[in-house]
């Protein structure tokens, strides 16, 4: 009899997965964690979170090695992108990285998984 590999099981409406398939967060660089942020006016960016400060102008985030996500394809939401990355990188438009980027009025900060961060770093630089 062939053995079946079970990746998930549902019991009373709750889906369970093997312990070893838990989400692994991306590694820090110099103690800084990789994040995906969404701001009110400056769009979506990802990079290493250097600082967060709450000011009268809103939350100000400083990212290191930051890239702006001008357009993405292959993820239904930023939540999916932060967990899985994008599955159509050839259609994405990500800027070249900048060493330091201070972004004002950040409304969402999402930690990146290891899989997502490695995936996003591989998206080609979009320039005109």
Model-identified regions with their sequence ranges:
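Nucleic-acid-binding small beta-barrel platforms of the OB/S1 family
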Residues: 1-2
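Conserved RNA-binding domains used in RNP assembly and mRNA/RNA metabolism
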Residues: 5-11, 17-128
